[in-house]
């Protein structure tokens, strides 16, 4: 957490760590960002980059992603979600984004289930020999762990994508 806290502090946000420096719990107070351009390394976690992409909408920000995950699944999921919320952004090269200050414009949004967590239930279906359905999850998911279902398919499992969700039998 220390890296993202430092990045946000350097952009003009006040963060007071209540216990150990660089860790939860902390208090954030801000009147906006002093910087209009930031760079974040995705090697540690692409979640920080995703959070920054979402927060950029509130103030307007140019973001440069560095590291190995600049084009990873979670970055793609975040950008897709922003589009669904009506957010416009400009992508320069593979790793640079310009997001102007805007408003989110979607009143209802179906959050896709976490495929990492769903894998346990799908694996359990093999052990107990019962069908398992995870609602609102589909094979066109952008989540990287969806590949687990293709591995199950190769092992002979029936993987069926229905309107309701994915069933393993």
Locate each region found by the language model.
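Structural preference for solvent-exposed beta-strand-turn elements
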Residues: 1-169
């Amino acid at each position: 957490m220390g890296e993202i806290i430092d990045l946000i502090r350097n952009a003009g946000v006040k963060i007071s760590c209540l216990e150990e420096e660089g860790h939860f719990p902390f208090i954030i107070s801000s009147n906006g960002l002093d910087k209009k351009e930031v760079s974040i390394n995705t090697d540690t976690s692409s979640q920080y980059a995703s959070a920054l992409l979402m927060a950029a909408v509130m103030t307007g920000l140019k973001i440069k992603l560095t590291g190995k995950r600049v084009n990873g699944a979670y970055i793609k999921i975040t950008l897709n979600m922003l589009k669904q919320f009506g957010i416009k952004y400009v992508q320069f090269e593979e790793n640079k984004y310009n997001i102007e200050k805007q408003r989110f414009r979607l009143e209802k949004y179906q959050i896709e289930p976490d495929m990492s967590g769903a894998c346990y239930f799908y694996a359990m279906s093999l052990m107990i020999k019962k069908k398992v359905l995870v609602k609102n999850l589909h094979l066109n998911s952008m989540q990287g762990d969806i590949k687990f279902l293709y591995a199950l398919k190769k092992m002979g499992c029936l993987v069926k994508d229905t309107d309701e969700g994915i069933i393993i039998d």
